[in-house]
A protein has these predicted regions:
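Well-ordered secondary-structure scaffolds
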Residues: 1-182, 193-195
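Well-ordered alpha-helical segments embedded in enzymatic catalytic cores
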Residues: 183-187
Length: 195
C-alpha cells in the first residue's frame, strides 16, 4: 500500500500585503459603476446623463430580491449610462461618473462615533442593510440582507464572522479586522446577538 510522507506540501501564501495598512487612493477622473457587481439580478440605474451626484447618492436600485442597490463613492456628474466590458470579457451595463470634488450627501454621518446602542428591530436593521446595498466581500458579492433572513420561527443561535480569504493574494479582510475591529464587533450587538 502506498502512503504519503508526513508534512505535505506548503505552498507560498502570497500574503505580501498583510502587513500593509489600508490606504486611501487618489480620486480618478472618471468612475465606472457596473450594475452587475453582485450575484443575482443586476441593479437598475436611477440616474441619467447630466445628473449631479455626491458621495452616498443612490445611483441604482436593487433589481430583485437577490440583488443590491448601488451608491456613488464619488461626487460629480453622470457622463453616461452605457455598457462596459467586465473582468470576464462580457459587456454589462454601467454608470460612468466624471469626478468633480469630494462632496458628501448631507444625510451621511461622517463622524468617528460608532453606534453604541441600537433601538431598531432586527427586521428594521435588515431593511436598512438591503436599502444600503451591503454585500459580502467574497467573489460573489452576495447581498447580505438575504443571509440575515432566517426562515420564519427560526432564530440565529450564533454569529460566525468568516474572514477567511477566498484567494491566496487577498488580505483585505485581515486588514479590516486589524484596523476596524471595533466597528466589526458592533454589528452583532445591533441585532441582539451579543447575549
Amino acid at each position: 500500500m502506498k502512503t504519503f510522507r508526513i508534512g505535505g506540501v506548503h505552498p507560498a501564501e502570497n500574503k505580501l500585503s498583510a502587513g500593509k495598512a489600508i490606504e486611501t487612493l487618489a480620486l480618478p477622473k472618471q468612475a465606472v459603476f457596473p450594475l452587475s457587481q453582485h450575484i443575482g439580478a443586476p441593479a437598475t440605474a436611477i440616474v441619467k446623463r447630466g445628473d449631479v451626484v455626491k458621495v452616498g447618492t443612490k445611483i441604482a436600485e436593487a433589481g430583485g430580491f437577490v440583488s443590491a442597490a448601488i451608491f456613488s463613492s464619488v461626487s460629480g456628474k453622470v457622463n453616461k449610462v452605457d455598457s462596459v466590458i467586465d473582468a470576464s470579457g462580457y459587456r454589462k451595463p454601467a454608470i460612468f461618473i466624471d469626478v468633480e470634488g469630494d462632496e458628501w450627501e448631507e444625510s451621511i454621518d461622517r463622524s468617528a462615533d460608532l453606534v453604541k446602542e441600537c433601538k431598531l428591530t432586527p427586521e428594521e436593521i435588515v431593511a436598512k442593510i438591503k436599502d444600503a446595498g451591503v454585500v459580502g466581500m467574497g467573489g460573489a458579492c452576495f447581498p447580505t440582507h438575504v443571509k440575515l433572513m432566517p426562515p420564519p420561527g427560526c432564530k440565529a443561535e450564533c454569529v460566525i464572522i468568516n474572514a477567511v480569504e477566498c484567494e491566496p493574494y487577498l488580505t483585505a479582510d485581515h486588514r479590516l479586522m486589524l484596523e476596524k475591529a471595533d466597528q466589526i464587533f458592533t454589528v452583532p450587538g445591533s441585532f441582539g446577538w451579543d447575549d
